[in-house]
């Protein structure tokens, strides 16, 4: 199938994937709402046939209802390590350690000596660029305070966003996903992000969430860790993570030491989709490219339906 005029090239689709794509494209929005089963089945077929690799797992939600549209994940309710996808919730817990919310600090990242993945460091970091560039040093500083004195705040955030409580013996590295002890079921994690970007809290917390949204928007731009997600109508919110691989039940085996994850929410200002993708044996930054292609398939169907 040829690319849409004016769009970047799309991957060729199999016959079954192409049929599902056309079914979605030709289905009016009213029909999708009246027959959600047909819409979800067509979307599932399109994504599975267009992205058949067993190394790619995903959860696609309707951002407004938090209902699952499509899913390919061996055990979607089993908790898994999610790496840096925990960072926004640690930031929320940090802000809730006082009332009014705490001010976020400026942290100087020197690189590996500060526990960061970027060997040369990020330099002076505040919340928004630290989230966009996933600076470990910055979030380790927040998490250290949360681990030592913010247990109640973290429990409130976990309960509000329906995340499992972290283990009792908390460390800063665990809270930001550097080590794999705090694990989250994939579907629950996608729903927590939907709640995060659509929540309507009090004015003080709305300001904090607004900064988190800005950081996730910048993550998808050049220089951000999710920049490979590409350009999309209305832009996107994104957060990457690279998590230690833990072999799962059955035939789930590690292909490398780590797995790449990315959460993509689109469009940024009026979210329609929440897409969580995990790709085995790579980084979150690389997985963002796969997620971007999946999102493009969804967007193409919407463009044709208009």
What are these regions (language model features)?
Residues 18-27:
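Bacterial N-terminal signal peptides
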Residues 100-155, 160-167, 177-178, 198:
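Conserved catalytic neighborhood of penicillin-recognizing serine enzymes
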Residues 1-12:
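N-terminal secretory signal peptides that target proteins for export/translocation
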Residues 152, 182-298:
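A penicillin-recognizing enzyme superfamily signal
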Residues 70-85, 163-210:
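Active-site-proximal helix/loop microenvironment
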Residues 66, 79-104, 130, 189-192, ...:
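Active-site SXXK
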């Amino acid at each position: 199938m040829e690319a849409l005029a004016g769009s970047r090239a799309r991957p060729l689709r199999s016959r079954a994937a192409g049929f599902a794509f056309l079914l979605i494209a030709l289905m009016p929005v009213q029909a999708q709402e009246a027959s959600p089963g047909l819409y979800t089945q067509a979307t599932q077929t399109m994504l599975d046939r267009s992205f058949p690799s067993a190394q790619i797992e995903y959860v696609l939600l309707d951002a407004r209802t938090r209902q699952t549209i499509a899913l390919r994940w061996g055990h979607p309710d089993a908790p898994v390590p999610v790496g840096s996808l925990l960072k926004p919730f640690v930031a929320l817990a940090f802000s809730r350690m006082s009332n009014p919310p705490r001010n976020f600090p400026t942290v100087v990242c020197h690189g590996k000596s500060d526990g960061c993945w970027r060997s040369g460091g990020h330099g002076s970091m505040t919340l928004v660029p630290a989230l966009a560039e996933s600076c470990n040093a910055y979030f380790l500083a927040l998490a250290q305070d949360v681990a030592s004195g913010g247990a109640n705040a973290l429990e409130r955030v976990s309960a509000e966003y329906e995340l499992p409580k972290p283990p009792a013996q908390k460390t800063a590295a665990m809270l930001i996903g550097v080590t794999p002890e705090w694990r989250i079921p994939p579907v629950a994690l996608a729903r927590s992000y939907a709640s995060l970007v659509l929540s309507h809290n009090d004015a003080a917390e709305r300001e904090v969430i607004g900064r988190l949204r800005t950081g996730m928007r910048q993550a998808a731009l050049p220089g951000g860790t999710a920049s490979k997600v590409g350009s999309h109508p209305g832009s996107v919110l994104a957060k990457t993570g690279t998590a230690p691989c833990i072999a799962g039940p059955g035939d789930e085996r590690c292909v490398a030491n780590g797995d790449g994850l990315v959460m993509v929410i689109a469009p940024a200002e009026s979210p329609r989709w929440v897409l969580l993708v995990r790709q085995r044996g790579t980084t979150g930054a690389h997985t963002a490219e796969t997620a971007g292609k999946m999102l493009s398939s969804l967007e193409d169907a919407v463009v044709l339906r208009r």
